[in-house]
């Protein structure tokens, strides 16, 4: 993101930070288990993960009263980031497919580095594209497919756009209205 703002050569590029609302809590277990199987994990391993997740329930005391119990990937559990990333791999593959089809152009943020179209670490996702409405539309379609499958919901207030130099305010306003 730093090179977007400082380098004069980088024009017409966007970094888009996606924040998923209560990302761990919202991850659909059925979706996660289907992914584990699709990625070649054994039934034994998948069942073990299922047991780890399904036997835990949380309940919170608030103002002396007990709130309803809830389930979900647990923040602080060492396994949760890995499971979340496995679930996020579907979004990453949707985006990679759009790059392969030529609908998105992977970008170079610096010389002598590979091109990138996305970065994912735990529940943080950053997408990169050229500043073209057609590419933004492709990214939006990927998110619109992924979110219902996974249970994720984009938190628009905490998500953000990081433009390179040379983009008009009119174009940035148009992006924000999408």
Model regions: which residues?
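Nucleotidyl polymerases of mobile genetic elements and RNA viruses
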Residues: 1-178
């Amino acid at each position: 993101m730093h090179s977007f703002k400082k380098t004069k050569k980088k024009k017409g590029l966007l970094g888009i930070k996606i924040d998923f609302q209560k990302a761990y809590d919202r991850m659909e277990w059925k979706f996660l288990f289907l992914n584990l199987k699709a990625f070649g994990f054994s039934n034994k391993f998948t069942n073990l993960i299922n047991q780890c997740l399904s036997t835990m329930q949380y309940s919170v005391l608030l103002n002396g009263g007990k709130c309803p119990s809830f389930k979900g990937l647990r923040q602080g559990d060492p396994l949760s980031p890995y499971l979340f990333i496995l679930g996020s791999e579907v979004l990453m593959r949707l985006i990679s497919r759009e790059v392969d089809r030529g609908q998105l152009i992977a970008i170079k943020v610096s010389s002598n580095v590979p091109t990138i179209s996305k970065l994912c670490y735990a529940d943080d996702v950053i997408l990169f594209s050229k500043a073209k409405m057609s590419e933004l539309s492709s990214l939006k379609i990927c998110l619109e497919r992924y979110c219902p499958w996974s249970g994720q919901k984009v938190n628009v207030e905490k998500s953000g756009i990081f433009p390179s130099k040379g983009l008009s305010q009119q174009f940035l306003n148009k992006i924000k209205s999408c």
